[in-house]
Amino acid sequence: MFSFFKSFLPTSYFLPGWLILDTNPVDSLLQGLVGACGISVLCSLMRVHLFLVEESSSDESDEGRKRGTPCRERRTKTGLTGMLQFFIVTGILSVVGSRVASLVVLEFCLRTVSGLVTSGQEYRTCLRQVLVQSQFSVGCALSCSLHFLHEGASQRWLCLLLAAALSWFLARQATRLMHHVMALYKLHSSQRYCGVCISLLSSGQLLLPMLCRTMILVFSVAAVASVSIINQHFLSATEALRFWTPLTICYTLLVVYMQDAQHGASGSEVVLNTVMVRLGGLMVLMLTVGRWADVLHILMCFLGEASCLIPTMDLLDAASSSQVRESPWKQQTGPQALSVRRDSQTGTEYRCVH
């Protein structure tokens, strides 16, 4: 179906081999679209979660409510800027090869496990920061997972087209939910008018665990796919060992360095330093044991991380804020949420939780 369009694409007669895409450009574009939709869903649901937390905490003081309203209004203004960012991320994920995407996934998995294990009492704050920082890594995880699962399929483009359509639908629904909650949650939750807002009011604390379970599933599949994709480029066990040994050492040193550098720095500063250090380390590694195509793709990863993190710095600051360190649903179970009611007929007292 796409053979006519593929005939106009550059071939190895005009471009060097390291500039040629690993797969069909149409397949790469569909994989990038799925990855960008996954990033959009993650950002929308994280904004909903942090909005619920801030809304619950701002109800305690009028000053907090006045200070929180402009921030929420600014977050809802996406429009053309949001669509431009979406298509930029789609293009970057389409260009980045499956090999470099696999390396990004493995590095993120190792860094996340190490960070959560050493987080201590700041576990929930660290978890929110990890979810915000994982945007481009989620796109790489979905892209390399689709590359691995559909490799060798006779109708690969059709499967990817269906996956892209479903991802687009989920991204649109998540965006609509975000705008609905930010605009009407306070009114609907107070008047018990909207089923969606009432569900979030009663079960909003389940949103973060649901996101965590989804991320665990996504990166578990992506980790298996990444190891398989990387091993496909080696003809013998000696070549594989020569690649995996410096890779493991480099990843371990990067994780240790970033854990030490996070102390005493602000949230935005930590994120920018982390991106520069880990992608810089990957570039040095690829210059040593990789290919020129890998170096080019890592440079594209710099742009991808920037296009994901810079527009969502407010989201990262909200995830790092001290106002959301303790879940507001836990606070509502204290003594202030208790009331005593007496039955007029039997005289029995009941203790109610609001």
Tell me the role of every PLM-derived stretch.
Residues C144-L149, Q259, G281-V295:
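Hydrophobic alpha-helical transmembrane segments in multi-pass integral membrane proteins
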